């Protein structure tokens, strides 16, 4: 979209300074309109020349097409925000580590008891496995 704008400005500057300005200004108006109104740019118009022309009207505000300015002014702010979000995520994981560890120990003890009942381990191995680590 910017490229089309810059090309149009360059053509206008060259046309103004040349003797062919009148010829260029009488170009078919539909040609310029077709170049601008194509594909996605149709959804991004901010101004409409004719309010009755629904073809160029901005889409309804459904939250999907709305364009907003970014909330961050620099990459450092984005980096800080991502670090904060990462730290919150890490703190949640560390907060759950006690429960996760207890669950893993319970599963290991159950597996050790099942192995002892099937005869895969001895009584001494069972006692050593069930002893609390130092």
Swiss-Prot record:
Signal peptide: 1-21
Induction: Expression is strongly up-regulated during the early stages of infection.
TM helices/strands, residue ranges: none
Disruption phenotype: Inhibits ethylene induction and promotes P.sojae infection in soybean.
Keywords on record: Host cytoplasm, Host nucleus, Secreted, Signal, Virulence
Biased composition (Basic and acidic residues): 61-70
The keyword Magnesium is annotated on this UniProt entry: no
Chain intervals for the UniProt region annotation (Disordered): 49-70
Location of this chain's protein in the cell: Secreted; Host cytoplasm; Host nucleus
Short sequence motif named RxLR-dEER, residue ranges: 44-68
A GO cellular component entry from the record: extracellular region
Domain of life: Eukaryota
Record text on subunit structure and interactions: Interacts with host 1-aminocyclopropane-1-carboxylate synthases ACS1, ACS2, ACS3, ACS10 and ACS12.
Domain notes for this protein: The RxLR-dEER motif acts to carry the protein into the host cell cytoplasm through binding to cell surface phosphatidylinositol-3-phosphate.
Known function: Effector that suppresses plant defense responses during the early stages of pathogen infection. Suppresses cell death induced by effectors and PAMPs in plant hosts. Is able to induced cell death in tomato, tobacco, eggplant, and potato, but not in A.thaliana. Interacts with and destabilizes host 1-aminocyclopropane-1-carboxylate synthases. By suppressing type2 ACS-catalyzed ethylene biosynthesis, Avh238 facilitates Phytophthora infection.
Note: Avh238 is highly polymorphic among P.sojae isolates.
Family membership: Belongs to the RxLR effector family.
Protein name, UniProt field: RxLR effector protein Avh238
Originating organism: Phytophthora sojae (strain P6497)
């Amino acid at each position: 979209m910017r490229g089309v704008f810059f090309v149009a400005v360059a053509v206008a500057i060259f046309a103004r300074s040349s003797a062919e300005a009148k010829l260029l200004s009488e170009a078919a108006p539909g040609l310029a309109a077709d170049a601008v109104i194509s594909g996605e740019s149709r959804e991004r118009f901010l101004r409409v020349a004719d309010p009755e022309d629904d073809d160029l009207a901005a889409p309804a505000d459904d939250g999907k097409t709305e364009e907003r300015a970014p909330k961050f002014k620099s990459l450092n702010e984005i980096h800080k925000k991502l670090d904060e979000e990462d730290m919150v995520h890490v703190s949640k994981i560390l907060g759950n580590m006690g429960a996760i560890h207890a669950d893993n120990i319970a599963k290991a003890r159950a597996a050790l008891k099942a192995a002892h009942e099937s005869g895969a381990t001895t009584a001494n191995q069972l006692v050593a496995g069930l002893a609390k680590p130092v």
